C-alpha cells in the first residue's frame, strides 16, 4: 500500500473554509482522503493523505479527477485559499 501525502500552506484565516472544501470533495468523490491540521506544529498547514494500492491506481484516480468539471470548480476555489508551494509525496507503507 502507498500513501499520497499532500501538504499545503493555507492563507491566514482560511483554514476552516479550506477544511470544509476538502472534506466536501472527499465525500463527493467517495475517496479515502484524510485531512490533518496541527494542534501543535506548523501554523496554517493542511495535510491530506490518500491511500493507493499502486502507482497506477494513483495516476488513474488523479487523471480521472482532474478531467471532471467538478475538479475545475474545486481548484478555482482552492487557489483562493492556499499559498503557492506545498508538497506532493508518495510513500510506501512497510
Q: How should these model regions be labeled?
A:
Residues 1-94:
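Short S/T/G/P-rich N-terminal loop/turn motif that feeds into the first structured element of a domain
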Amino acid at each position: 500500500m502507498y500513501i499520497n501525502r499532500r501538504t499545503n500552506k493555507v492563507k491566514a484565516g482560511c483554514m476552516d473554509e479550506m477544511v470544509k472544501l476538502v472534506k466536501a470533495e472527499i465525500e463527493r468523490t467517495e475517496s479515502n482522503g484524510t485531512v490533518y491540521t496541527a494542534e501543535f506544529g506548523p501554523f496554517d498547514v493542511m495535510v491530506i493523505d490518500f491511500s493507493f494500492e499502486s502507482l497506477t491506481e494513483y495516476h488513474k484516480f488523479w487523471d480521472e479527477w482532474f478531467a471532471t468539471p467538478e475538479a475545475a470548480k474545486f481548484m478555482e476555489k482552492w487557489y483562493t485559499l492556499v499559498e503557492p508551494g506545498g508538497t506532493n509525496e508518495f510513500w510506501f507503507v512497510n
